[in-house]
């Protein structure tokens, strides 16, 4: 498996996330090695997960040097697994959580989505947008919740 950490270091990325394909293997030895490489380059190490109920406890129990966690998190529970359990887990831990899929692949409007995120321990959000209309609607609603 190829790990493209060096190119991200060269372009001066501030945070470098391990892809979910790596994080969700929950291989402590490999994960520690990659996170150490990121930290030793002076970057903030993070991990993405598509299986938060399995991978976040793995991160926490192994005391991994992971400052930020990117996970699916949205009002409808899409892509989250057990929504209530993920909410409880996120709200109970001190990590910089970043929500992905906050609009549940277009099933939730930004107006509905962002207040929900603001009720939980979500520090940032990443949203896929295609049209100018989507950009304006999403950014306008995000500014109302995230300051």
Where are the predicted features?
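Active-site beta->alpha loop and helix N-cap motifs at the rims of alpha/beta catalytic domains
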Residues: 1-26
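Beta/alpha (TIM)-barrel catalytic core signal, keyed to glycine-rich beta->alpha loops juxtaposed to Asp/Glu
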Residues: 19-147
């Amino acid at each position: 498996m190829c790990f493209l950490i060096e190119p991200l270091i060269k372009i001066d990325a501030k945070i470098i996330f391990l892809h979910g394909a790596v994080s969700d293997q929950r291989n402590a030895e490999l994960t520690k090695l990659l996170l150490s490489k990121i930290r030793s380059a002076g970057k903030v190490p993070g991990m993405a997960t598509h299986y938060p109920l399995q991978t976040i406890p793995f991160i926490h129990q192994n005391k991994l040097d992971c400052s930020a966690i990117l996970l699916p998190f949205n009002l409808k529970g899409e892509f989250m697994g057990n929504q209530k359990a993920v909410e409880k887990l996120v709200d109970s831990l001190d990590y910089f959580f970043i929500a992905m899929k906050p609009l549940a692949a277009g099933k939730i409007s930004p107006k509905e989505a962002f207040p929900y995120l603001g009720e939980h321990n979500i520090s940032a959000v990443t949203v896929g947008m295609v049209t100018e209309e989507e950009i304006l609607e999403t950014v306008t609603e995000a500014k109302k919740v995230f300051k």
